[in-house]
């Protein structure tokens, strides 16, 4: 759940990270109808709470992990919070907990390869969403430094098959372009 404080020139990095985590939770919890308004509100509140320590002191060891969000959800009074936490449990302490840690990938390298081939069916969509978030963080950091970023994606059809992931990606990309009448 890394956060780049230069995530956007226009929007709050925390708002964008909350939007990402809402997309993540929508994949996990949402079902066909997606997240309900109360669920979105609870998740947004918990995201703001879980990132507070990092925003006060932005050090790598303060970056929250999914387990921190899970813990804060369990502390909330709404029954929806408990349902969301229960849905996240398999990704926090269950058999699909591969993303419940700080990243071990050095994304500062000039060339980074994300390989999600070995992720099982249950994790592939989440893996694609996380990769898109990491790439976006790198693009914004490079933009702040005046550097171009080249992004090559093999198996693009996997991204195109997933409407929610593609929607999240497109929303971020299109926000950077101006349309002139």
Model region roles, listed by residue range:
Residues 2-179:
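P-loop NTPase motor domains
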């Amino acid at each position: 759940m890394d956060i780049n404080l230069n995530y956007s020139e226009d929007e709050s990095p925390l708002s964008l990270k909350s939007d990402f985590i809402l997309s993540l939770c929508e994949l996990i919890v949402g079902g066909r109808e997606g997240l309900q308004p109360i669920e979105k509100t609870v998740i947004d509140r918990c995201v703001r709470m879980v990132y507070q320590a990092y925003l006060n002191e932005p050090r790598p060891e303060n970056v929250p992990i999914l387990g921190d969000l899970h813990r804060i959800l369990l502390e909330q009074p709404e029954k929806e919070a408990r349902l969301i936490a229960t849905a996240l449990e398999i990704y926090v302490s269950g058999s699909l907990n591969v993303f419940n840690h700080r990243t071990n990938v050095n994304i500062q390298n000039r060339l980074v390869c994300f390989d999600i081939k070995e992720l099982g069916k249950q994790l592939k969509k989440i893996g694609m969403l996380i990769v898109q978030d990491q790439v976006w963080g790198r693009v914004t950091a490079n933009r702040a430094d005046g550097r171009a970023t080249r992004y090559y994606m093999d198996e693009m059809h996997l991204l195109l098959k997933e409407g929610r992931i593609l929607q999240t990606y497109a929303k971020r990309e299109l926000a950077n372009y101006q349309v002139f009448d």
